Amino acid sequence: MRVGWAVGPVDVIDRMSSILGHVGAWAPRAEQVATAKLLDDAAGIQTYVTEIKRGIVSRLSALHEGIQAFKAQGLPVDSLSPEGAIYLTVRVAPFGKKTPDGKVIATNEDVRKLLLDRAGVGVVAFQAFGYPDDDGWFRMSVGAVSLRDIQEALPRIGEALRSLS
């Protein structure tokens, strides 16, 4: 369960409050007391935040470096250097190539399915965020995976791309 707060325009907060009033999603008293106590521990919070950031940077860097290594090997991929958040912007564009079973990769959906089915990796196409083009741009999250997960996934991604002809 999460304990949190929101800050924003009065009309937005009022609408949020009216929704929450009907959801019954209030945090139990024990969690509220524990959160209040935690907020008094500035050093503890800073240590926690520092560790979280360090882990995110490590995972983003590993994923970016892996994608760039594939690019250097001539695979049809690229990634933008991470600048924050928990997402890496990647381009996976093997358009026109065929899967081992003869399917031509023609759309971002084809790429998404290839990575999911052959590498066990989920990606979100930029179309989900309103980007109109079907040109291989995706978002990959490192928020819920470990460094080891990334290190194990990269070879599978490479194998999936190398399986195309």
Regions found by a protein language model. Give the residues of each.
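PLP-dependent class I/II
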Residues: M1-S165
